[in-house]
Amino acid sequence: MSDLILGIGEYGVSKTPGSMVKTYALGSCVAVTMYEPNLKIAGMVHVALPESKLNTAKGEQCPGYFADLGVPLLFKEMVRLGCHARGRGLVVKMLGGAAVMAGNDTFNIGKRNILAVKKILWKLGMGPVAEDVGANYSRTVSLHVDTGLVNVSCPGRGQWQI
C-alpha cells in the first residue's frame, strides 16, 4: 500500500487498493477531490492560485498550481483512466480556501480560489457534492481509494469526514 502525497500545485490519481491520496496544510489553497466509485479511481489537485494569467511561466511549469489549469487536468487524467468523459458518476468535493491571515487577507486568496474552482467545475458540467471551505484554519486532506471517503484534520480541531 503506497499513498500518493501531493504538494502545492500538484495533482495525481490513484487506483491502488488500500491507498490514499493526501495533501497537507491547506491554508488559502483549495483541494479538489474526484472519485469514481465503480472504478475506484481517486484523484486530487492542490490549487494555490485562481488563474494562470498571473504567471504564465509558472502555469507551464506547474499547471496544478492554478485552478484554471489544474482542475481540468485532474479531470482529464480521471477520464484517461476510465471515468466518463462528461463526468457522470464522479463524486467531486472541495476543501480549503481559508483566510489564514486573520484580519490581514487583503487579497482574499482563499475566497478567490473557492470561486475560481466552482466556476471551472461548472464549466466542466460538475459541482461539488460536499465542501469544507473558508474559515480561518489549515486542513490536511486524505481521499481513500477504496471508499471515496475524504478525511479532514486540523491541529487543535480534530478530524472529520466530508
UniProtKB/Swiss-Prot annotation:
> Which domain of life does this protein belong to?
Bacteria
User: Do you know which Gene3D superfamilies this protein is assigned to?
Assistant: 3.30.1330.200
Q: Which reaction does it catalyse?
A: L-glutaminyl-[protein] + H2O = L-glutamyl-[protein] + NH4(+)
* Keyword field contains Hydrolase: yes
- What top-level class of enzyme does the UniProt entry assign? hydrolase
Keyword DNA-binding listed? The answer is: no
Q: What are the recorded GO MF terms, alphabetically?
A: protein-glutamine glutaminase activity
Q: Which SUPFAM superfamilies match?
A: CNF1/YfiH-like putative cysteine hydrolases
Q: Which GO terms describe its biological process?
A: chemotaxis
Keywords of this protein's UniProt record, alphabetized?
Answer: Chemotaxis, Hydrolase
Q: InterPro entries from the entry?
A: CheD-like_sf (IPR038592), Chemorcpt_Glu_NH3ase_CheD (IPR005659), Cytotoxic_necrot_fac-like_cat (IPR011324)
Q: What is its EC number?
A: 3.5.1.44
What PANTHER family does the entry give? CHEMORECEPTOR GLUTAMINE DEAMIDASE CHED-RELATED (PTHR35147:SF1)
Relate the protein's function as given in its record.
Probably deamidates glutamine residues to glutamate on methyl-accepting chemotaxis receptors (MCPs), playing an important role in chemotaxis.
The UniProt family comment states: Belongs to the CheD family.
Full protein name? Probable chemoreceptor glutamine deamidase CheD
Say which species the protein is native to. Answer: Syntrophotalea carbinolica (strain DSM 2380 / NBRC 103641 / GraBd1) (Pelobacter carbinolicus)
Q: Which gene encodes it?
A: cheD
